[in-house]
Amino acid sequence: MNMIESAKAQVRQLTAAAYDKAAAAGLLPAGIAVEPAVEIPKDTANGDYTTTFCLAAAKAMKMNPRQVAQTLIDNMTLTDSYFTSVEIAGPGFMNFRLGEKWFADTVSGIETAGEKYGENDTLAGRKYMVEFVSANPTGPMHMGNARGGVLGDTLASVLQKSGADVWREFYVNDAGNQIEKFAKSLEARYFQIIKGEDAVEFPEDGYHGDDIRELAQAFYENEGDKYLDCDEKTRHDALAQFGLSVNIPKMKADLARYGIQYDQWFFESSLHDSGYVADTVQALTDRGYTYEKDGALWLKTSDILAAQLRQEGKSDEAIEKLGLKDDVLCRANGFYTYFAADIAYHRNKFAVRGFDKVINIWGADHHGHVARLKGAMDALGLDGQHRLDIVLMQLVKLVRDGETVRMSKRTGKAISLTDLLDEIPVDACRWFFNAKPETQMEFDLGLAVREDSENPVYYVQYAYARICTLVKALAAEGYTVPAAAEADLSVLTADEEKALIKQLAQYPAVVQLAARDYDPSFINRYLVELAAAFHKFYNACRIKGEAENVLLARLKLADTARAVLKNGMTLIGCSAPEKM
């Protein structure tokens, strides 16, 4: 249900019917095919909806636009419509004003839709995957993971609200160079525990965090010096598997605490073990996109990207200046690169599991990888340009009292997701991290815990709790929230009442916009605006002590606002507490 679109459609219908009637009577030239464009004026003094039909049609009619508008108005019937009046404005705009039927139908429609309010079928029948966080399982999750987690999870919810069949996935990088580095780092700490700190040099490019020391200590307590004298591969495998067996469950627990659950944790190692990476590289070779050099197998990345750029209208000279480079798929030692595995993983998403659209949430530092991966999908015939979308998110800066915060007060280490959740409520974390992905965000730790109107999540939750308190108080006096059909909604004529209903009607369009732009922060901004509209209504329109029909109508409106506030908060993964 989208009452704004319904009103716009009715403006078009009324305008078209008036034109047909006037043309049939010979008052306007017949055969003018102009689709009435309908907008919502920025200034409500100009009506609730406006159309530029007369301006567009007047030229073809060879008439003055205001004359066309007056003729249409004279032949327009508003009976049983959502509108009470239509006026001419400016050079020939027709401005329509809503009547009580639209306001009553909006409240009634929200009641009928219930928790499904805001749902639409824009993406119905489409199978989407959202892959997000996918942090290396070699250490604690950081603030970029925290932001990506909220963005991915909330975007998935918004896409579901728009009718898509959505799959949430975490890609576990449990193979390749970073796991070898992980094993060597654990090995060095393991040796140091047994032989002494100075007996073994730590790898310069190793993982230096205290978490590596803690994992090595736990491994030693479990296994003793059992792996001291065995062959290196056996020791590395044992250390890496132990580290992953500790880190991955902890990641799952932290993300669950954060309100994030996945449909699947997909392991990179499974692509290697099944031979799918090798099969994918062979598929690229069979299509003529690889070559051998210096004992390694290379992907013709530069050719793939150049072909795409030519399709976009770039000249060969401009392409040459970009300095495009090819990528190694298989090293001279026979090991596949991370890029080869990533290509195989995305081929699996499309060719094996059949997703229509794949959305990856990445840090902005991966921007150079976007075109290469899309190009690889194109080379495999999987239309990466249109089926693979990458949302790049900017960095996060934590601040407190105007100062940048880098270390946890409790641990003295770099702040991890665990540290953040220990200090800041989950609702605040999810709210603040759900910001526009392309903007660098500043997370104010002090603001996130404030209990006043400056904190947006508190402001919205307070509006919800305020309504819950009102409903309970009136119930104690014998007034229960009526069904829309039983309330006299025609008494809701105050500007603040109408403004609140108009704001409630915006919600379905906001959901669609958030899904279209891959930007769920539209929901946050909407909720703040809705809370503000409710507070204005509540402060201007007394409920207690009014005549019963007015009291019940306003109570119904307040409860409708409560339902939509909860709907939106649930959509972005925040709670709606009944008490504050």
Regions from the PLM with identified roles:
Residues D105-I110:
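Short, charged, solvent-exposed linker or helix-capping segments at domain edges/interfaces
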